[in-house]
């Protein structure tokens, strides 16, 4: 019998991002209770030796599964040390992989307080408006003029620690161009 391959999209991330993600998830599951329906699975609960952790996030009838991996082949760069993340949408027997932006939007819609477009209607009707959006990563579009005016009038408060963002987890912080200090550049580059 032939080998059967299954291809998955795994986002290469650095180990410290995974550590930060896991600690934020646990904080919001056990301390702030904003993610109390989420399920965290340790590496020893998985049959796959490459799985370091799994977070199951119920989203309506379905669930998001964010799986972190270790011991993968290293990447092209020295800092790609074999750690990765996959993001999967599962509903009954159907599953598909999704990108980090969509995962953030789904989490945002189902779990966190949001100062959204409904605030405009409430303000016009004279109702009290809550100026909070706990999950700014879920907002990708530019708001309407009324929405922008309301956000300028009532500034949202920041939560500490921040809520876990899948987009932030898979963000490539290594390949961004480095900013040098001042107009003369760095001291080591120009020999002073």
From Swiss-Prot:
Residues 40-44 are annotated as: Interaction with host APOBEC3G. Processed in virion by the viral protease. Residues 151-164 are annotated as: Multimerization. It is a peripheral membrane protein. Keywords: AIDS, Host cell membrane, Host cytoplasm, Host membrane, Host-virus interaction, Membrane, Metal-binding, Phosphoprotein, RNA-binding, Ubl conjugation, Ubl conjugation pathway, Virion, Zinc. Residues 170-192 are annotated as: Disordered. Induction: Expressed late during infection in a Rev-dependent manner. The modification Phosphoserine is found at residues 144, 165. Residues 171-172 are annotated as: Membrane association. Residues 151-180 are annotated as: SOCS box-like. Residues 75-114 are annotated as: RNA-binding. A motif (BC-box-like motif) lies at residues 144-153. Residues 54-72 are annotated as: Interaction with host APOBEC3F and APOBEC3G. The keyword NAD does not apply. It holds the Pfam family Vif. Its main location: host cell. It is found in: Host cytoplasm; Host cell membrane; Virion. Disulfide bonds: none annotated. GO terms for biological process: viral life cycle. It comes from the Viruses. Vif-defective viruses show catastrophic failure in reverse transcription due to APOBEC-induced mutations that initiate a DNA base repair pathway and compromise the structural integrity of the ssDNA. In the absence of Vif, the virion is morphologically abnormal. Homomultimer; in vitro and presumably in vivo. Interacts with viral RNA and Pr55Gag precursor; these interactions mediate Vif incorporation into the virion. Interacts with the viral reverse transcriptase. Forms cullin-5-RING E3 ubiquitin-protein ligase complex (ECS complex) by interacting with host CUL5, RBX2, elongin BC complex (ELOB and ELOC) and CBFB/CBF-beta. Within the ECS complex, Vif interacts directly with host CUL5, ELOC and APOBEC (APOBEC3F and APOBEC3G) substrates. Belongs to the primate lentivirus group Vif protein family. Counteracts the innate antiviral activity of host APOBEC3F and APOBEC3G by promoting their ubiquitination and degradation. Acts as a substrate recognition component of an E3 ubiquitin-protein ligase complex: mechanistically, Vif hijacks a host cullin-5-RING E3 ubiquitin-protein ligase complex (ECS complex) and the transcription coactivator CBFB/CBF-beta to form an active E3 ubiquitin-protein ligase complex that targets APOBEC3G and APOBEC3F for polyubiquitination, leading to their degradation by the proteasome. The BC-like-box motif mediates the interaction with elongin BC complex. The HCCH motif (H-x(5)-C-x(18)-C-x(5)-H) mediates the interaction with CUL5. This is Virion infectivity factor. It comes from Human immunodeficiency virus type 1 group M subtype H (isolate VI991).
